[in-house]
Amino acid sequence: SQNESELASVLAHETAHVTQRHIAREINAQSKQGLVSAATILAAILIGAAAGGNGSAMEGAIAAAQGASIQQQINFTRAQEYEADRVGIGFLASAGFDPNAMANFFEAMSRQEGLNGAWIPEMLRDHPVTGNRVAEARARAAQYERRKSSQSVGYALIKERLRVLTTPREELLHLYTEIGSAHEPELDKNYGRALTLMAIERPAEAVKILQPLVERHQGNTLLYAALGQAQMEAQQKAEGLATFEHALALFPRNVPLSIRYAEGLLSAGRAQEAHVLLLDLFNNIEPTPPQIRLTAAAASQAGDSGDAYYYMSEYHISNGDLALSVQQLQLALNAPNLTVVQKERYQARLDEIRDYLATARMQRTSSNQ
């Protein structure tokens, strides 16, 4: 994407797939089509047998039936894509973005594809980025007020971060050498150069770049996170922790800042503070699996083995492994020095998971009978 509106168009398109229940509709359509396809193939076999068992004729009939089935699936998927375009453009306009951004993004995708897919007919492509699709997107966008595409500071910084994460080290060094010698380089390029210095293990130099950026742009969490991380990596731990603490005072419960602050506290031997910080985050914002695992690690380093096992149980639940979750809860219940509240909480969670597993087994048994 070249701007924030184009990025938003991708999200709007995918959101439309969800709101229009395309996955559920596709599963239902495939189940119905499977029966039709099976019946068609069976009919082809019977007709071939009745005609004297001509093997070539039967093979041709079966291939035709299978081809028709595949084409119907492609048509259904293609219709979903066009519907997601139409609904997504409405989302895009309602959110204040440029409704033409989706068509612009399609054109950029088409240029990127080049000749790679030129041999595939449009009717056989389930995600056709063609003139027809672009034209339909532009016609749909014309129904809404046109807005100018903008690019926020956050978007520009994220692009630099992604560039650093995906570009080989030697290429990054060449890319940012010229930028570093320029007079008053752009914020995003300076940020990218600082991230590059961190990637090649020169964090102290990154700190010198990031400190003035933070002072000039105090409302940007990405800059605070990068500065705090650079300070920690440069063994300026007191300064790094102070940076994170100040940032969280400005942006309470910001997840990336909280995670990096917790990691900094753990590296500084302040596990109990990290544990408290992560528990507050866990209880107020839907956690990610890595975040839950870090919470368990903080509990372990803080000497709370019961909570360490408990949050490892939650980590396994987040990954869909309920058997391992049960094992961790059993270990939690056998941990020393548990409070009454901890015992009751661990047991309640264990009972909940066991009840769920028992119900799931009963449902599988009844469905197999």
Predicted regions and their residues:
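Short pre-active-site segment immediately N-terminal to the catalytic Zn-binding motif
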Residues: 1-9, 76-79
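Catalytic Zn2+-binding segment of zinc metalloproteases
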Residues: 2-5, 15-32, 50
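Extracytoplasmic and endomembrane cell-envelope/extracellular-matrix remodeling and assembly machinery
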Residues: 70-243, 253, 272, 321, ...
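Canonical positions in the second alpha-helix
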Residues: 179, 212-213, 246-247, 280-281, ...
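Structural register within alpha-helical repeat arrays
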Residues: 193, 227, 261, 295-298, ...
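Terminal, low-structured helical/coil segments at or just beyond the last alpha-helical repeat
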Residues: 301, 318-369
